[in-house]
Amino acid sequence: MEIQLRNYAHLGDALWEVIVREYTVDKAVNAKSLHKMTTERVNAKFQHDLLITIDELLTPEEKDLVRRARNIPVPIGRRNIQSEYRMATAFETLMGFWYIHNKDRFEEMKDLLNKKIIF
């Protein structure tokens, strides 16, 4: 059974939230700062920027997955910019895809994002 791209994105969205929360849980001094640190990183603009940052590290197959995921028809909220939202969906799709099919790559990118990019 083949998994649809939107299902990878759904999983990737949850994974990204957990990654950020794991990192921020011991960094914040109170609930307000914890929420602020998390929401600054769990949003379409931030994920769009991350995908652009890691683009040069992606394999041709991963870049093809990004291209296909950008074109998934998804509802876009009023406050989101369409191009950013589509790139964020592609980022989430990559995270979900790696988690299901290539745990080593998932861990590699998770470590890179934690150490060098997001914090």
PLM ranges: what are they?
Residues 1-119:
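Double-stranded RNA-binding/processing signature
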